[in-house]
UniProtKB/Swiss-Prot annotation:
Stated family: Belongs to the lyase 1 family. Argininosuccinate lyase subfamily.
Record's keyword annotation contains Cytoplasm: yes
Name of the gene: argH
Full protein name: Argininosuccinate lyase
Source lineage: Bacteria, Pseudomonadati, Pseudomonadota, Gammaproteobacteria, Pseudomonadales
Catalytic activity: 2-(N(omega)-L-arginino)succinate = fumarate + L-arginine
Length: 464
């Protein structure tokens, strides 16, 4: 029986070519071609191992390696012809290799399946992405440390429920983001450990009958360990899900930070100014200067959250081992990594350029009875129970609201209406400086604690 020849590597079983629409629908080359560098890296390592175990001759290995390197140069020069009829990045590269070096190119796939090939490619790619993202987190943290050190004495209101709560230093506030990003860094480092396990050698699902030595390819590709089960190696994408979970947490932190920057740049706050290069204007309102970078980062967080949900949904119903569903793992993973990396880059560039408006911050901290807790603590030190002190200060605050006076603006006689325990030394704790300086412990907002935290932060970054 005569059968029309197809370009697919698996066409021998079939009696007719794939429908043209189905071929386009099932092809992944339009998005997985970004894996080309890691696909070639894996193939070179695989060919090197096959030569060491005698499956390929040294001459065949050299021809394959040279051909793959030339193909990489073609791709990077923009002259490579990506073909949808060849489905994916793997078969496009293999077909071009065979075009270049002949029948030897067909030997490259010996002892390997696209199932373990793509799992290896994704892990290699994600490992590199994590390393880039970690570097951007560090760069952003360095910027936060520099700004926090410069603003260690700058007083601003701290908020709960977006209402004035207690005075803090701007430097202390910035260091909160440093801490959160530090945990994001740790999560990604930990995630990388599980990404960096090699599935290559799992073949389709059960391993291979060839005398492969997986330790060789593991070492050549820089993996920490060989995967212990071939079914697991080709079928699970928990490492990608874990990355998206860590990326979602990082984007959540950036989104919250973005919200603060948007508020602080508004006319209602005016706490900070962003350089023009990080803002845009309005097509109709000439006066507008919009904080587009933080607004967009805030919005982009949803893309990463969506990638996490999408991957969880993708995997939840699949039996072992590989299923075509897994082709859908790449686009959300790629997008999550791109979004996090670019958001971090934008923030790492922008944060050191933030210009605080110190007097406006200070005036905002002065309003809203932000030293009320300090007055309560003062009365506790005079021997009164805290709950009684809380009520006393509450009455004083009500008086202040009615009279239009902050606590520090009241006379001693006015304050003594609420407790005879109040003496002239009370004004030492009612000042903004007195309030922040009193919180002089590790993790507190006192300026010297901010400087100490900056020093610890720099030491931490130096050890990475």
């Amino acid at each position: 029986m005569s059968v029309e020849k197809t370009n697919q590597s698996w066409g021998g079983r079939f009696s007719e070519p794939v429908d043209a629409f189905v071929a386009r629908f099932t092809a992944s080359v339009d998005f997985d071609k970004r894996l080309y560098r890691h696909d070639i890296m894996g193939s070179i390592a695989h060919a090197t191992m096959l030569a060491k175990v005698g499956v390929l001759s040294d001459a065949e290995r050299d021809a394959i390696v040279d051909g793959l390197q030339q193909i990489q140069a073609e791709i990077e020069a923009g002259s490579f012809d990506w073909r949808v009829d060849l489905e994916d990045v793997h078969m496009n590269i293999e077909a071009r290799l065979t075009d270049r070096i002949g029948v030897t190119g067909k030997k490259l796939h010996t002892g390997r399946s696209r199932n373990d090939q793509v799992a290896t490619d994704i892990r290699l790619w994600l490992r590199d992405e994590i390393d880039t993202i970690l570097a951007e987190i560090t760069r952003l943290q360095e910027g936060l440390l520099g700004l926090a050190e410069a603003e260690a004495d700058t007083i601003m209101p701290g908020f709960t429920h977006l209402q004035t709560a207690q005075p803090v230093t701007f430097g202390h506030h910035l260091l909160a983001w440093f801490e959160m990003l530090g945990r994001d860094y740790e999560r990604l480092v930990d995630c990388r450990k599980r990404v960096n396990r090699m599935p290559l050698g799992s073949a389709a699902l059960a391993g291979t009958t060839y005398p492969i030595q997986r330790e060789i390819t593991c070492q050549l590709l820089g993996f920490d360990a060989v995967g212990g089960n071939s079914l697991d190696g080709v079928s699970d994408r928990d490492f990608a899900i874990e990355f998206c979970a860590a990326a979602s947490l990082a984007m959540m932190h950036l989104s919250r930070f973005s919200e603060e920057l948007v508020l602080w740049t508004s006319a209602q706050f005016q706490f900070i100014d962003l350089p023009d290069r990080f803002c845009t204007g309005s097509s109709i309102m000439p006066q507008k200067k919009n904080p587009d970078v933080p607004e967009l980062v805030r919005g982009k967080s949803g893309r990463v959250f969506g990638a996490l949900t999408g991957l969880l949904t993708l995997m939840k119903g699949q039996p072992l081992a590989y299923n075509k569903d897994n082709q859908e793992d790449k686009e959300p993973l790629f997008d999550a990594a791109d979004t996090l990396r670019d958001s971090l880059r934008a923030f790492a560039d922008m944060v050191p350029a933030i210009r605080p408006r110190r007097e406006i911050m200070r005036e905002a901290a002065r309003r809203g009875f932000s030293t009320a807790t300090d007055l309560a603590d003062y009365l506790v030190r005079k021997g009164l129970p805290f709950r009684d002190c809380h009520e006393i200060v509450g009455h004083a605050v009500k008086y202040g609201v009615d009279s239009g006076k902050d606590l520090a603006e009241m006379s001693l006689d006015e304050l003594r209406r609420f407790s005879e325990q109040i003496d002239a030394d009370v004004f030492d704790v009612l000042t903004l400086e007195g309030s922040v300086n009193a919180r002089d412990h590790i993790g507190g907002t006192a300026p010297n604690q901010v400087r100490a935290a900056v020093a610890r932060g720099r030491q931490l970054l130096a050890q990475r």
